[in-house]
């Protein structure tokens, strides 16, 4: 079993769910093992100064719950041809691009075009590199910063 970079290790945490936001009775068995393990201690969060949203699997909050975009009323595999029902949309950046787990690897769905780009070989390496990459470019954080300055 590999050691995981935990969600709380990500820099710039802006939000994380309170205990009342989490429905502990919800099952996580359908999730890939790595994602279920990652979400066990903290059911997702918003980190990297708002640039990265890791969705929760047991969330009571519709905007934070991964199930609607995975298997529910906003399922990405219907909205985008390149996304399959097996892809798990576990995260999004501040520009609306989605990060999907596909056969253990992380791919990025470019929301504007519907194209997929390979990002990392595993969820673990995705998290490790998330903190090291330039978030202004990689996550589109410069646009979020500009919006915050102007509003």
PLM features: what roles do these ranges have?
Residues 107-143:
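Compact, glycine/acidic-enriched structural inserts
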Residues 1-101:
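A surface-exposed partner-binding patch
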Residues 20, 51, 64-66, 102, ...:
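Generic alpha-helix signal with a bias toward terminal, lower-confidence helices
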Residues 144-151:
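Low-complexity intrinsically disordered segments
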Residues 98, 104-109:
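Short polybasic amphipathic segments
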């Amino acid at each position: 079993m590999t050691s995981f970079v935990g969600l709380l290790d990500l820099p710039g945490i802006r939000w994380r769910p309170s205990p009342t936001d989490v429905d502990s009775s919800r099952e996580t068995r359908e999730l890939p093992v790595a994602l279920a393990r990652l979400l066990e201690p903290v059911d997702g969060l918003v980190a990297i100064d708002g640039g990265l949203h890791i969705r929760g699997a047991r969330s009571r909050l519709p905007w934070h719950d991964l199930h609607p975009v995975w298997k529910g009323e906003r399922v990405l595999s219907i909205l985008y041809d390149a996304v399959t029902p097996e892809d798990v949309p576990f995260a999004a950046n501040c520009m609306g691009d989605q990060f999907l787990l596909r056969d253990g690897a992380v791919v990025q769905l470019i929301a504007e075009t519907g194209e997929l780009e390979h990002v990392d070989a595993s969820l673990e390496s995705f998290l490790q590199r998330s903190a090291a990459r330039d978030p202004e470019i990689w996550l589109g954080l410069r646009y979020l910063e500009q919006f915050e300055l102007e509003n």
